[in-house]
């Protein structure tokens, strides 16, 4: 091939390559234009559709990597608009209690990362129910779980997770530093109250939607404490009860009215012969009913009922079916304190229906074992020990602990009444078992006007753990 032919050949090849490159560029421009046209056209359509948003989060914890996949269904038109929870409905008529949740936290914690907790409780907004709990700043089966039988420490915090889930670092939300707490939702935001600090100078920190709004200082300098269950919201105002003073004698008890995290009114109860601790409260036809723990001298439970102006009435559940623990055998009740085996106690609850009462109580008279619900049709006002219905939920051979009430508002359930519910703490570890830690799981039930069943839903963990050996 002579030089002229070489030049012609090279030129032809370059021309062909250039033409191909030009064609590819034109195709690329056309593709981009078509894609842009499709996206612009999609934005002009406003039809209702369901979207699924999948979020992937990588996090590392104790040299192990976890991938949390959160699949959130977003349904167009679903109401997430804030509403004011009215709280003016009456309690739903019920025949028994259906199992609602069980978190199995201790069983899962033998191998997984689960918080050491106590004092769990449940509270619901108009959109969801959450389990709140007081952590010990430690995980199960870890060295920092040692000594967590202690009630008050600077490591304790109020946290929350979706109801029915074991409380872990991966599904829990921090709420407040606290060794005593309560929380509730007014339809627009969460109110949390966390008490922390030294016994003689404790301070309650109020938060609304996570922002500090006010503080309340201990006024008797003797372990300021609150409910360990949900506060109550009615027509935009939330209500809670705090105690300050001795646990074995007369103390000071105050009701607080709170709006958007700010205290608008408070009163001190005039109750010199009563003792109110760890009250379990619920709304009923626009008023608030609280059933509490008498740690001083009553084996039946004291109650306080008040309206939105904090005008109140006080008393004790009259039934001879006694609700506290320890307690004597059922017998003759009293509308004042029943002094037999009245010292000490445990957090509990009851629901009033006219002259009748659903009494939730530990089955054992002397130790925190078993749990049962009893319907006494005249127990709010009469002192006999006859009852109509008994439903077992934890067997006498299994550990129980604190219990408390919570409600599901009509704005959540779609019912025209307030659904009564309760939770039971299932305490494991010290001081009754040979471990270095104390923690608990929980179960919960809601009232239904249909068939229910007797059974036992125990904690079920096999102890001791590896850390205990």
Swiss-Prot record:
Positions of region (Hypervariable stalk region): 36-90
GO cellular component: host cell plasma membrane; membrane; virion membrane
Catalytic residues (UniProt): 151 (proton donor/acceptor), 402 (nucleophile)
Glycosylation sites: 44, 50, 58, 63, 68, 88, 146, 235, 365
Function: Catalyzes the removal of terminal sialic acid residues from viral and cellular glycoconjugates. Cleaves off the terminal sialic acids on the glycosylated HA during virus budding to facilitate virus release. Additionally helps virus spread through the circulation by further removing sialic acids from the cell surface. These cleavages prevent self-aggregation and ensure the efficient spread of the progeny virus from cell to cell. Otherwise, infection would be limited to one round of replication.
Domain of life: Viruses
Name of the protein: Neuraminidase
One Pfam family from the record: Neur
Intravirion side: 1-6
GO BP terms, alphabetized: carbohydrate metabolic process; viral budding from plasma membrane
Catalysed conversion reaction: Hydrolysis of alpha-(2->3)-, alpha-(2->6)-, alpha-(2->8)- glycosidic linkages of terminal sialic acid residues in oligosaccharides, glycoproteins, glycolipids, colominic acid and synthetic substrates
